[in-house]
């Protein structure tokens, strides 16, 4: 798939912009704080209805404006597909082929994206919430039912926590009813995640082996606070530990176990990657991104759109070369950079844009 064009209204520092893209490589050039990253963020937001930089929607709407609007035309094997998203203080309105979508899971997946940004380098050593977000975004794009199960789980979790906070005299029978619902959706969420991690590990290990000249093997472990013997027993194991934690949850007034507290661990040659060198960690992240592309292609039979936000400056020449070599010519790629000097072997069928003060100019590469 590829994004033919995007129309932007009141997004970040853009009042209005309309840009047509190459189906291959698109490079946004400009000094810092001109709006290069905002373009990639707009594409990401059009695909996923969320930002990778902030969880506050109001930060996305241009200063002194009340709403933003993004329109795009995506080319897929099945034909051209118009996408639209409107954001205001009343919430989001999403449309596919001009038809309003009732649920988030109905919208996400029509345009798949893989983002590689400098903050991704924190995936290994950062907080567990970053790794859960990584799973949710990738898995949600290839398996819409996961988003539905996750949404239902979070809804029941919110109910359970609100009830625990609302009273000092907890009705154990009512709490047990919530436990049953939480275990139903939580078990589904964990099963989806386990299947995804297994597939991701297979793809990422192969890429990491190539990057390390066949020296290193990559493993990914899903770390749950629920003892998982096999996928059939997850619900019962979750229910058991919820029951065992009743006293703790009543005292703390929150839910201490469940997939909302799970984590990922990465291992390089059986060593926790958080103790690895910076070079090893960068190779690991690069391997994950390559694996994301391959996995989305395998499941959806179409390549995702690749967003590279100023990551070339974070990679040495060897990793830059491996990244560029790994990008299939069918993958539409968007890249931001302050200079083309450090980039070599660029394809002839690219488009280059100069970004200055929230305005985008198409330019010719010398």
From Swiss-Prot:
The keyword DNA-binding applies. PROSITE patterns: RECF_1, RECF_2. Keywords: ATP-binding, Cytoplasm, DNA damage, DNA repair, DNA replication, DNA-binding, Nucleotide-binding, SOS response. It is found in: Cytoplasm. InterPro entries: DNA-binding_RecF, DNA-binding_RecF_CS, P-loop_NTPase, RecF/RecN/SMC_N, RecF_2. ATP binds at residues 30-37. CDD domains: ABC_RecF (cd03242). GO terms for cellular component: cytoplasm. It holds the Pfam family SMC_N. GO terms for molecular function: ATP binding; single-stranded DNA binding. The keyword ATP-binding applies. Its main location: cytoplasm. One of its GO terms (biological process) is double-strand break repair. NCBIfam families: recf (TIGR00611). PANTHER family: DNA REPLICATION AND REPAIR PROTEIN RECF. The RecF protein is involved in DNA metabolism; it is required for DNA replication and normal SOS inducibility. RecF binds preferentially to single-stranded, linear DNA. It also seems to bind ATP. Belongs to the RecF family. This is DNA replication and repair protein RecF. It comes from Streptococcus thermophilus (strain ATCC BAA-250 / LMG 18311). The lineage of its organism: Bacteria, Bacillati, Bacillota, Bacilli, Lactobacillales. The gene is recF.
């Amino acid at each position: 798939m590829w994004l033919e064009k995007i129309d932007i209204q009141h997004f970040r520092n853009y009042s209005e912009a309309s840009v047509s893209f190459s189906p291959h490589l698109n490079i946004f050039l400009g000094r810092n704080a001109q709006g290069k990253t905002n373009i990639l963020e707009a594409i990401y937001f059009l695909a996923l209805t969320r930002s990778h930089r902030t969880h506050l929607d109001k930060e996305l709407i241009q200063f002194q404006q009340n709403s933003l609007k993004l329109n795009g035309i995506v080319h897929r094997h099945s034909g051209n597909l118009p996408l639209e998203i409107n954001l205001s203080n009343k919430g989001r309105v999403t449309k596919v082929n001009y038809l309003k979508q009732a649920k988030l899971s109905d919208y996400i997946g029509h345009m798949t994206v893989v983002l590689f940004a400098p903050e991704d380098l924190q995936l290994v050593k950062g907080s567990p919430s970053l790794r859960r977000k990584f799973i949710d975004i990738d898995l949600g794009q290839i398996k819409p039912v996961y988003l539905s199960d996750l949404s239902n789980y979070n809804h029941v979790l919110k109910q359970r926590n609100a009830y625990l906070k609302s009273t000092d005299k907890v009705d154990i029978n009512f709490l047990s009813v919530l436990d049953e619902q939480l275990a139903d959706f939580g078990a589904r969420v964990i099963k989806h995640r386990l299947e995804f991690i297994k597939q991701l590990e297979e793809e990422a290990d192969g890429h990491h082996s190539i990057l390390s000249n066949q020296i290193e093997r990559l493993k990914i472990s899903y770390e749950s606070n629920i003892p998982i013997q096999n996928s059939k027993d997850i619900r019962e194991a979750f229910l058991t530990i919820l029951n065992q934690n009743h006293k703790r949850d009543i005292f703390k007034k929150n839910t201490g176990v469940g997939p909302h507290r799970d984590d990922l661990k990465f291992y390089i040659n059986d060593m926790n990657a958080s103790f690895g060198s910076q070079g090893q960690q960068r190779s690991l992240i690069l391997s994950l991104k390559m694996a994301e592309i391959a996995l989305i292609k395998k499941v959806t039979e179409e390549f995702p759109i690749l967003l590279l936000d100023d990551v070339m400056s974070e990679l040495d020449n060897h990793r830059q070369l491996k990244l560029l070599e790994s990008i299939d010519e069918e993958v539409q790629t968007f890249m931001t950079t302050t200079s083309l000097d450090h980039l070599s072997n660029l394809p002839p069928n690219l488009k280059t844009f100069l970004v200055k003060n929230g305005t985008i100019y198409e330019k010719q590469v010398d």
